[in-house]
From Swiss-Prot:
The gene is proB. Its main location: cytoplasm. Keywords: Amino-acid biosynthesis, ATP-binding, Cytoplasm, Kinase, Nucleotide-binding, Proline biosynthesis, Transferase. Pathway: Amino-acid biosynthesis; L-proline biosynthesis; L-glutamate 5-semialdehyde from L-glutamate: step 1/2. Its EC number is 2.7.2.11. Substrate binds at residues 50, 137, 149. This is Glutamate 5-kinase. GO terms for molecular function: ATP binding; glutamate 5-kinase activity; RNA binding. Coiled coil: none annotated. CDD domains: AAK_G5K_ProB, PUA_G5K. The keyword Ribonucleoprotein does not apply. Belongs to the glutamate 5-kinase family. It comes from Salmonella typhimurium (strain LT2 / SGSC1412 / ATCC 700720).
Amino acid sequence: MSDSQTLVVKLGTSVLTGGSRRLNRAHIVELVRQCAQLHAAGHRIVIVTSGAIAAGREHLGYPELPATIASKQLLAAVGQSRLIQLWEQLFSIYGIHIGQMLLTRADMEDRERFLNARDTLRALLDNHIVPVINENDAVATAEIKVGDNDNLSALAAILAGADKLLLLTDQQGLFTADPRSNPQAELIKDVYGVDDALRSIAGDSVSGLGTGGMSTKLQAADVACRAGIDTIIASGSKPGVIGDVMEGISVGTRFHAQASPLENRKRWIFGAPPAGEITVDEGATAAMLERGSSLLPKGIKSVTGNFSRGEVIRICNLQGRDIAHGVSRYNSDALRRIAGHHSQQIDAILGYEYGPVAVHRDDMITR
């Protein structure tokens, strides 16, 4: 249909469990019903699901396990199959097929893998199949994890070319303060840009079952909106919430998409989880933010992490604030060696060069 839209729905652990230790199947049935109704109307639906660890813990009878990464991955390995079976069973009631996609950060960092994931996701949608996406928690290490399903959902929205991203949670939306401890807190209904003031009031969820809080939802909204995707944070327990969002009814907190969205390559740069981090001096900060300049080695103060040439890195100012993301022209070891030096010295220091800049302005997104 001509007015068909693509919606990515992220379902957090607190929504799927209702705050308990087990999946709330009755509630999941209702969420699937809403999605199926939209699917029947010609809309394209993508599910980003949490809950694998909770499903694994329930299936194994809530075993007492040490609080280690291995234990979580054990539970995820058991729970992931149970979770996907549940989604398949419920969507099949409406004659809808699903397709599972397990992603890691590596799928987003590498441009070719990013494009492959995009093509797979869009092929599923083109064939009226509902993609069900989760991070591959059973094998992902800290180095290759996106980290939380909020940011994963923003990346999925970019991959899908979505019109809207809906982050369902156990809160009504983003408030001026934590409503659990401050009765004067007010719901923020509309946001037209994520800034430091907004970041400072985004407290973390008290749910012990998931990995994302309100701060990660804010990060996801920022990424999606700058890619031209409206983002809504709303309560997963609100009746008819998914349909309301598609109809444009005001629910929760709406983050309005940037009027001039990033072009495709820069969407990838902005959305890709950084492989490392560099800190730059005040001169470099001003040059990038005020004049749109490339980053020269001279302005680099320190390099954190190990990354390859061509990977996306985070650029921070001296106060530790994330000011830009960009594709590094040099690997981390090379950047450490040329940091603080003039560009004319690169060849003498390294014995080779890939140009005078560390990060070119055409491969950079300022925040």
